[in-house]
Amino acid sequence: MNKDNTVFVGNKPVMNYVLAVVTQFSNGATEVIIKARGKAISRAVDTGEIALNRFLEGVRKKEIITSTEEIETDSGKTNVSSIEIVLTNVPL
């Protein structure tokens, strides 16, 4: 898996990330990973669903990975949820 095929979801509008995913597949990628942490997780899920249902034919969800990351803040360590959604256009 090439790191260039990873879309990191943040606070921008969802369609920006959808365009990034569609562009990766248009450029010949066989897999694209959508990653997000914390409050951006719902935006990542929206990105994957919009890309699959409205723009990409023959692409499917390969894997969804959820985890918890421990990050250092000013007030100490805190846990942040994260998600990785792997999309692929390789047939089953």
UniProtKB/Swiss-Prot annotation:
Subcellular location(s) of the protein: Cytoplasm; Chromosome
Keywords (A to Z) from UniProt: Chromosome, Cytoplasm, DNA condensation, DNA-binding
GO biological process: chromosome condensation
Predominant location category: cytoplasm
Keyword hit for Nucleotide-binding: no
Gene Ontology MF terms in the entry: double-stranded DNA binding; RNA binding
Keyword DNA-binding among UniProt keywords: yes
GO cellular component, one term: cytoplasm
Pfam families associated with the record: Alba
Family, as annotated: Belongs to the histone-like Alba family.
General function of this protein: Binds double-stranded DNA tightly but without sequence specificity. Involved in DNA compaction.
Name of the molecule in the record: DNA/RNA-binding protein Alba
Gene: albA
